[in-house]
């Protein structure tokens, strides 16, 4: 069973955020693989109009090209936000952090399967820093 990091840490911790805010951000991150898939589909010029019509876009004009561009921008901004914040959290561990927060992976998995080059304490410090930075970026 995977280690589950507790969303509640001491309010004295430099990266403290509210428990419910942590859950909100965690679930925001877990949407990343879906965003990547949809972004790739909207980047493909051969995507049929039926794909565009499936996405709820009630406030977007009827022009399919405009819809495609707006949806690429929408998903692209979210993808870039997570990648930028992971890079800010740690220059060397950003790939591991991004993989962990977007796929729900534990430190144990990162260490045994992916060979993360740091200890548990350092990793979880950067993990908390990631969510703290993301919270600031999303405000």
Q: How would you label these PLM feature ranges?
A:
Residues 123-137:
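DNA major-groove recognition helices of helix-turn-helix
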Residues 103-120:
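Helix-turn-helix DNA-binding module
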Residues 1-88, 108:
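N-terminal interaction/assembly modules
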Residues 43, 90-93, 134, 138:
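Long, hydrophobic, amphipathic alpha-helical segments used as structural scaffolds
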Residues 73-76, 101-103, 123:
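Short acidic alpha-helix initiation/capping motifs at coil-to-helix transition points
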Residues 98-102, 115, 128:
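Short amphipathic alpha-helical surface patches that mediate protein-protein
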Residues 88-105:
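Short amphipathic alpha helix immediately N-terminal
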């Amino acid at each position: 069973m995977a280690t589950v990091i507790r969303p509640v840490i001491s309010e004295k911790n430099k990266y403290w955020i509210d428990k419910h805010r942590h859950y909100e951000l965690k679930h925001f991150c877990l949407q990343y693989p879906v965003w990547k898939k949809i972004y790739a589909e909207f980047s493909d010029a051969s995507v049929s109009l039926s794909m565009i019509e499936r996405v709820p876009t009630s406030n977007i004009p009827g022009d399919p090209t405009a819809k495609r561009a707006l949806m690429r921008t929408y998903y692209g901004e979210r993808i870039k936000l997570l990648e930028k914040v992971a890079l800010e959290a740690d220059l060397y561990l950003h790939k591991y952090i991004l993989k962990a927060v977007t796929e729900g992976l534990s430190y144990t998995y990162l260490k045994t399967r992916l060979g993360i080059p740091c200890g548990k304490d350092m990793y979880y410090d950067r993990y908390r820093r990631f969510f703290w930075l993301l919270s600031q970026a999303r405000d």
